[in-house]
Amino acid sequence: MRAWTGSWRWIMLILFAWGTLLFYIGGHLVRDNDHPDHSSRELSKILAKLERLKQQNEDLRRMAESLRIPEGPIDQGTATGRVRVLEEQLVKAKEQIENYKKQARNGLGKDHELLRRRIENGAKELWFFLQSELKKLKHLEGNELQRHADEILLDLGHHERSIMTDLYYLSQTDGAGDWREKEAKDLTELVQRRITYLQNPKDCSKARKLVCNINKGCGYGCQLHHVVYCFMIAYGTQRTLILESQNWRYATGGWETVFRPVSETCTDRSGLSTGHWSGEVNDKNIQVVELPIVDSLHPRPPYLPLAVPEDLADRLVRVHGDPAVWWVSQFVKYLIRPQPWLEKEIEEATKKLGFKHPVIGVHVRRTDKVGTEAAFHPIEEYMVHVEEHFQLLARRMQVDKKRVYLATDDPALLKEAKTKYSNYEFISDNSISWSAGLHNRYTENSLRGVILDIHFLSQADFLVCTFSSQVCRVAYEIMQTLHPDASANFHSLDDIYYFGGQNAHNQIAVYPHKPRTDEEIPMEPGDIIGVAGNHWDGYSKGVNRKLGKTGLYPSYKVREKIETVKYPTYPEAEK
């Protein structure tokens, strides 16, 4: 009877644990009713969890019934086995209780995070607007008006930095910073496991493959993004990426001489059948599919940016300000794992240059971009935002020196910057600027230079650049892999973030807007706006898809429309 007394203690403990868990979740349901604006979607998820727990509780009840002392002889082996199962269930129950407690303590909820980021964006957009409008007043009349306008701008700068500092501390309060750190790490590890599983099939001869040739006719940043696009299609169609990089214009030995191979088990493109991309469904019986550049892709699959995986979307929206960039960054992270020699080169360059924090990264693209894809921007335009961000950093950390990592393809710019801004410490390697020139661009030395520039730009506390440049966007993408959420750690002098060949970038109107000029478009809440760009003056430009009208609209009156797609989830990667 003593053995059975011990068993019943376990049973009572299990039932008590599950009862506690049910009560705990039930309490959350009651508290949520105090907030009528809480989304029905979140409520239904909690109810679904509750239903599952009720079912598990019923299963345990039946198991407990089966362990009642029977009339007649006792099968000790069977009873011991059942008790062991119940012990395991108890451990799981305790873990779930702790997880729910942690979520309540640290997870502030998706709506809280969305609101926090909207306040942050609204404050910044207000600042852009006021700067633009008040600067216009300088030219109206008299020195007095100009002096007064300068004072207003100065005061507004203090206000804006105060708001941004408060928001930063809000983002870290009540364990939110620790939660965000852990959640971002968990999501990254999950995605990297899935990619690693896909890229390392047990039998390469039977694996479904997608072939991507790196030699697109463009520079390093563009070629890297080309491979990322291939990788995302491979991931979505459950095909192992085969990267063809021999005679790469930057390194004739191929990708693997610089970065780690994209696969340890499968680099051979051979297969029973081969064909050019004709769509996921049409290619289902083709083992090896060759992918064209994104400009020639037809039909276009749903896996292109700016879409994110459906199964990760809710978690990503909570933890990151731009889920689409985070998703792209995961493929960049996997691709640019350095070979040992490159890792050593980066370490030596870090020491030689004296790269340390706090530091702001500035990327100035000149040469072939100016006059074609981008306008000329003097160094003064960049340094305005550098100074603003150093003043913001000084609110929450000690700024011993105002360091700037300057990356440019204009060798004369470093001297100009040092002359004009002697109170800054410029960190730069002018040999990289020379190697980035048009005549030296496609060499191994140039590749080393652009990799180092991108590395240090991504390591900076803040990035000032032009998003029309692929190098700048790559640095921004890598930056996302180094922090839980670095989506706001930049200022672009021209474009908003985009991925070449992406699907439409849409926003949703949250406030109505009545045009005041012919340049503006009307909006009603819920309208879908196809965004063309942000003018960084409080207004963006786009098309109201319902009305078919293109024009300006206040940036704060919209929010991002998160596009999701049903990507494979690769459960085998967790085994």
Swiss-Prot record:
It is a single-pass type II membrane protein. Pathway: Protein modification; protein glycosylation. GO terms for biological process: cell migration; fibroblast migration; GDP-L-fucose metabolic process; integrin-mediated signaling pathway; N-glycan fucosylation; N-glycan processing; protein N-linked glycosylation; protein N-linked glycosylation via asparagine. It catalyses: N(4)-{beta-D-GlcNAc-(1->2)-alpha-D-Man-(1->3)-[beta-D-GlcNAc-(1->2)-alpha-D-Man-(1->6)]-beta-D-Man-(1->4)-beta-D-GlcNAc-(1->4)-beta-D-GlcNAc}-L-asparaginyl-[protein] + GDP-beta-L-fucose = an N(4)-{beta-D-GlcNAc-(1->2)-alpha-D-Man-(1->3)-[beta-D-GlcNAc-(1->2)-alpha-D-Man-(1->6)]-beta-D-Man-(1->4)-beta-D-GlcNAc-(1->4)-[alpha-L-Fuc-(1->6)]-beta-D-GlcNAc}-L-asparaginyl-[protein] + GDP + H(+). A motif (SH3-binding) lies at residues 299-305. InterPro entries: Fut8, Fut8_N_cat, Fut8_SH3, GT23_dom, SH3-like_dom_sf, SH3_domain. GO terms for molecular function: alpha-(1->6)-fucosyltransferase activity; glycoprotein 6-alpha-L-fucosyltransferase activity; glycosyltransferase activity; SH3 domain binding. Residues 365-366 are annotated as: Important for donor substrate binding. This is Alpha-(1,6)-fucosyltransferase. Disulfide bonds join C204-C266, C212-C230, C218-C222, C465-C472. Catalyzes the addition of fucose in alpha 1-6 linkage to the first GlcNAc residue, next to the peptide chains in N-glycans. It comes from Rattus norvegicus. It comes from the Eukaryota. Belongs to the glycosyltransferase 23 family. The keyword Iron-sulfur does not apply. Tyrosine phosphorylated by PKDCC/VLK. The lineage of its organism: Eukaryota, Metazoa, Chordata, Craniata, Vertebrata. Residues 1-9 are cytoplasmic. Residues 206-493 form the GT23 domain. The gene is Fut8.
